[in-house]
């Protein structure tokens, strides 16, 4: 029986509708964790003043490029900027790992007939979290590098790596073997994987543009809303990819 996109979309929407509360709670919970971690690890107010102390000089050199801007910073400003970047990256990474592990375990538990919740699914994913952490870190670096060089390589890498988290969790395989298997399956079924990945990327961009226009004064609330909606889109993609992999494996 051929695998069609319509069948995958229908199965994905059916599962999402039936488990919407758990998926929504997991998306918001991981978004909250991301925002709290970012806030806890970010530079203090005194350190942030170091960045703004010579803001007029820095703002006048923005047009010259990011690298020139960084080079014109003092060592203290560069340290604060690095700390801010590291805090945001680590917080987002932890949130993505918890979301990925939780959603994939939720699908498995529900498919096996178990009643579960967002917290229980995340707890059940504990044995895979460290492996997922290194996998998602590697995938994120590769995709962002591809996006920096040119958008198309980044999209192609996102397609190639899309099934690797599913393979790591379901097959309990290693990181590189999962990436190899994912690349082969993803490009072997490009009609099923490419549209989903492109739609996911466009949806995340649209969410960023829309939410940034909302009249929300609290940065914390804005961060939770933005990350929560982005996580919800990612959760739906994971459900789609899990269903696709199950059909391919069968």
From Swiss-Prot:
Localization: Cell inner membrane
InterPro entries in the record: UPF0259 (IPR009627)
GO cellular component, one term: plasma membrane
Spans through the membrane: 20-40, 90-110, 132-152, 156-176, 192-212, 222-242
Name of this protein: UPF0259 membrane protein PC1_1998
Keyword DNA-binding annotated: no
Keyword annotations from UniProtKB, A to Z: Cell inner membrane, Cell membrane, Membrane, Transmembrane, Transmembrane helix
Stated family: Belongs to the UPF0259 family.
Paired cysteines (S-S): none
Organism of provenance: Pectobacterium carotovorum subsp. carotovorum (strain PC1)
Membrane topology qualifier: Multi-pass membrane protein
């Amino acid at each position: 029986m051929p695998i069609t996109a319509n069948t995958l979309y229908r199965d994905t929407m059916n599962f999402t509708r039936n488990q919407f509360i758990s998926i929504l709670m997991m998306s918001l919970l991981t978004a909250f964790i991301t925002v709290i971690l970012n806030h806890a690890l970010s530079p203090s107010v005194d350190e942030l003043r170091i960045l703004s102390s010579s803001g007029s000089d820095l703002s006048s050199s923005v047009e010259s490029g990011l690298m020139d801007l960084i080079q014109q910073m003092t060592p203290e400003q560069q340290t604060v900027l690095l700390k801010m970047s590291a805090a945001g990256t680590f917080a987002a990474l932890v949130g993505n790992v918890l979301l990925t592990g939780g959603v994939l375990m939720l699908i498995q538990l529900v498919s096996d007939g178990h009643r579960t919740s967002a917290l229980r699914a995340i707890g059940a994913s504990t044995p895979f979290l460290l492996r997922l952490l290194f996998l998602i870190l590697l995938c994120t670096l590769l995709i962002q590098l591809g996006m920096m060089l040119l958008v198309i390589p980044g999209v192609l890498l996102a397609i190639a790596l899309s099934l690797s988290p599913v393979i790591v969790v379901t097959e309990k395989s290693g990181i590189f073997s999962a990436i190899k298997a994912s690349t082969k399956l993803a490009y072997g079924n490009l009609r099923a994987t490419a549209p989903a990945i492109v739609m996911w990327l466009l949806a995340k961009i649209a969410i960023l543009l829309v939410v940034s226009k909302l009249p929300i004064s609290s940065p914390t609330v804005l961060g939770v809303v933005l990350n929560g909606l982005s996580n919800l889109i990612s959760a739906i993609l994971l459900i789609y990819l899990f269903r696709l992999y199950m059909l391919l494996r069968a």
